[in-house]
Structures are given as C-alpha cells and as structure tokens.
Amino acid sequence: MENKTKRIKPLFVVDLLMALLGAASAYTGVEIHYAGHFQEHSAWHGWSVVHVVINVAWLIVCFLHCKHHWAWYKSLFKGMPSCSRKSKITLIVNFLFAATAFTGIGLLLFAEGQGTHLGLHHYVIGIALTALCLGHFIKRFSILRKGLRRK
C-alpha cells in the first residue's frame, strides 16, 4: 500500500524558522537596548545571553536558507545583465544581515560590557535589517503559507 501523506518541504520549514528566529532576535535586541537604559546590568546580561543563543540558531538556519537559494547567489556572480528591484532589496537584506552578524561577533569577541559604540552600530543596523526582513517576509508570506500546508 502506498503512503499518501505528503510531507512539508524542508525549504518551507527553514523559511518559517528564519521568520520566527528573526522575530525573536529583533525582540531580544530591543530588550537588550531597553535594559541598557532602564534596568540593572543583570537584566541586560540575561537578555544578551538569550539574544546570542537565538542568533547562533538563526545563523545556522540562515546558512541552510542560503543553501536552498544557492542558484540565486550563483546567478549574481555570473553577471546578471540587470538586477531586478526585488533582487536589489534581497541583496540589501543579505548585506545588512552580514553587517549585523559581523558586528554581533565583534561584540562577543571584543566588547567589555554594555554601552559600546559597536553595540550602538549593531543595534541601528539590526533595526534596518528588521524593517527590510519584515518587508521581505510579507512579500513572500502567501508562498510560505501555501508551502507549509500538507496536501
């Protein structure tokens, strides 16, 4: 007897995880910023630990996401004659993600606590990333919703 149940494609699970972890990253990032201004250092530290754990998971899922879309990345290096508006925004999202990741890693390796200039840059770049990721997600939400349905 043939198994008729369809499985959800891993691509859509990865996309859903990207959205959930991205939202969690943004939330904990704002909590860190708030705690740095209005709460004790222990609250700032606690949110920082949660933020790092979430973002390590997000980074892993991001690599899986990029692997699924590797053909798009390869097309960039083959010299597309004209980059569409959608591709330009996706490129900016990629650039902001990399900038946020590198500043975050820099904070982990070199910062001595809260209130650093690098931390402020990380926060501002993270806000820009969040705004563009939200638009990126909204544009593709119907595709994700259809892909997550079992048929």
What would you call each of these model-derived segments?
Residues 1-151:
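Membrane-embedded alpha-helical bundles that constitute the cytochrome b-like, heme-associated redox core
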